[in-house]
């Protein structure tokens, strides 16, 4: 009686786990990590939302109205983190009036006014969790007082000032009118609009925005630049000629004014991406 023939054992399936395959428990651990990470993110989102809601509920607004003897002030300096600033020159004013509107949320807005060595210094600073922080400032002053204004996030407006004017904003427009003497206007992200200028020297520049300058009297020197935007100058139609320099990487140039390379009146215009126009009133 012959022995039965035994078939060889079947070959391992290619789909079966090999000894080198990672244990199944690692998949569970990975899933746990994702669950924990998602839970943390959800908790953070809930905390952030709760803080925003608490900040909104805690929002408060207050106003101030203060006056200072103009004879004791030789300059005005304003610096605000968030908030529009307006300065208006008034003939015959013997007081400098400062009106402010201060808004705060979960944390207080640090707002202060003080006189230091003849300089009226106004500050509006935002702290942590200061989503609702804002310091709006309106000033009425004699026209001959020099002003320096810095705002991180909002517009600046100055009118009818004959002293030196220096304005800077990170994110906001600058609008001025009827200024004279030396003027500097600078914005990182915003337009610069100036009208009825009698400034002897003016520098205006923006990273992203339009520069538009309209003069009521011939300037001595103008430097106007925009990295991304058009630049336009409108000059009074008088016999004066100008030493003109224009430069744009991507844009057209229209320079329909009287020019003279030996003139002591200088205009420099440039734009990275934008048109340059210098003309007389139409």
Map each language-model feature to its residues.
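Short, surface-exposed interaction patches in beta-rich subdomains
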Residues: 183, 194-282
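Short linear S-[DN]-x-LW-Φ motif typified by the pepsin-like aspartic protease active-site region
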Residues: 3-4, 54-119, 136-140, 146, ...
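Non-cytosolic head/periplasmic domains of membrane-anchored proteins
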Residues: 119-208
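Terminal targeting segments of Actinobacterial cell-envelope proteins
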Residues: 1-33
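General beta-strand recognition
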Residues: 86, 97, 119-121, 157, ...
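Short, surface-exposed beta-strand-loop junctions and turns on beta-sheet-rich folds
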Residues: 93-95, 105, 128-129, 220, ...
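Hydrophobic membrane-insertion alpha-helices, especially the h-region
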Residues: 30-53
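A generic beta-sheet turn/junction motif
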Residues: 80-82, 91, 115-117, 151, ...
């Amino acid at each position: 009686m012959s022995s039965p023939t035994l078939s060889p054992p079947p070959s391992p399936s290619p789909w079966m786990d090999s000894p080198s395959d990672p244990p199944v428990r690692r998949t569970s651990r990975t899933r746990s990590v994702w669950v924990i990470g998602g839970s943390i993110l959800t908790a953070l989102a809930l905390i952030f939302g709760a803080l925003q809601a608490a900040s909104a509920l805690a929002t408060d607004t207050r106003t101030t109205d203060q006056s200072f003897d103009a004879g004791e002030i030789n300059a005005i300096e304003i610096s605000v983190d968030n908030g529009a600033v307006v300065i208006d020159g008034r003939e015959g004013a013997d007081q400098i009036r400062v009106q402010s509107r201060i808004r705060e949320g979960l944390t207080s807005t640090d707002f202060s006014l003080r006189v230091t060595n003849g300089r009226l210094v106004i500050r509006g600073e935002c702290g942590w969790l200061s989503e609702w922080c804002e310091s709006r400032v309106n000033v009425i002053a004699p026209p001959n007082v020099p002003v320096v204004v810095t705002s991180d996030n909002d517009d600046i407006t100055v009118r009818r000032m004959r002293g030196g004017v220096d304005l800077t904003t990170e994110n906001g427009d600058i609008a001025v009118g009827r200024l004279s003497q030396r003027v500097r206007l600078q914005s990182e992200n915003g337009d610069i609009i100036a009208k009825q200028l009698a400034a002897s020297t003016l520098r205006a520049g923006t990273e992203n925005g339009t520069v538009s300058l309209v003069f009521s009297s011939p300037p001595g020197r103008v430097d106007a630049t925009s990295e991304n935007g058009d630049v336009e100058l409108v000059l009074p139609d008088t016999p004066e000629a100008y030493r003109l320099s224009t430069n744009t990487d991507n844009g057209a140039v229209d320079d329909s004014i009287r020019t003279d390379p030996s003139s002591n009146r200088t205009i420099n215009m440039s734009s990275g991406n934008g048109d340059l126009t210098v003309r007389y009133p139409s």
